[in-house]
Amino acid sequence: MKTCKLMFLTFSLFLVTVCFQKTIGQSIVALKLPGMDNVIVKKDIPYIKTSDSTLKMDVYYPPNFDFKSKIPAVVCVFGYTNKGQIKAVGKQLRKFGQYTSWCKVIAASGFAAIAYETINPENDLISLMNYINANSGNLYIDARRIGAYSCSANTPVALENILNSSNSFFKCAAIYYGIFLDKDFKYLSTIDTLSRNMLFIPSRLPESTTWKKDVPLLIVHVGKDFVPHTDESLTGFIDKAINQKVPFTLIHYATGIHGFDAYTDNEETGQIIRTTIEFWKYNLKQ
């Protein structure tokens, strides 16, 4: 029985991968804002340099940004390794249309947007945060006003960091069709096996009694997610978040699919994306 469940889950994620690969040219966020085509992009900024490798990030700035003052930023947080990203969509996520267009939407809304490459997602996220803190002046980013965007199997890494009591970097986060991995989640072994195949990091949530309680979350759940067990992972998380008084807003997109922000161009999708932008503006005090 367990083998059948694993095969079904693997097949479902295979369908996600095929869907992404077949629609790479169409993977653009379903919201067009004025100025998106004129945002300023600084590519391939090294944020880690070691004897073995150099990891880079791209920073998107609003159109006509004068580089005279610091602005709030939103980081696209990744949980797939570079190899996993290429396996899933054929290229690094920072170069994938869904994320380049998200970064343009974010920048056109008045923020800086950051997307980066990663070999070790958990450690590299910490290195990225340290780099931004140390270089906020040169980057023209207000390190006191940083938000996050993360979706799908990227979200365990994001949530592990954001809910950690030591987090002083992220001030809010938008989580789209995510996976919430408590230590007692009954499908952990299945997710772990899947993560080894798909090359994403199944980070565990911290112990709920230690969750950071001043980082608002915007959670967007979809009713037609064909990735199994996302419903169970969310309901378990919501119960604990309420008990621990973690601030969150839940949007249940009843007819939404996994990847709706790039693959479902309709008014409801557009409204959810606009709500996400307003969420960042409010919590980052833009």
Q: Where are the predicted features?
A:
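C-terminal catalytic histidine-bearing segment of alpha/beta-hydrolase fold enzymes
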Residues: 235, 242-286
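N-terminal cap/lid segment of alpha/beta-hydrolase-fold proteins
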Residues: 26-69
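Gly/Ser-rich "nucleophile elbow"/oxyanion-hole loop immediately N-terminal to the catalytic nucleophile
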Residues: 69, 130-152, 164
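Short glycine-enriched nucleophile-adjacent loop
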Residues: 155-166
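The feature captures the conserved acid-bearing segment of alpha/beta-hydrolase catalytic domains
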Residues: 172, 178-244
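Short amphipathic alpha-helix adjacent to the substrate-entry channel of hydrolases
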Residues: 88-113
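Short beta-strand element of the alpha/beta-hydrolase
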Residues: 68-81
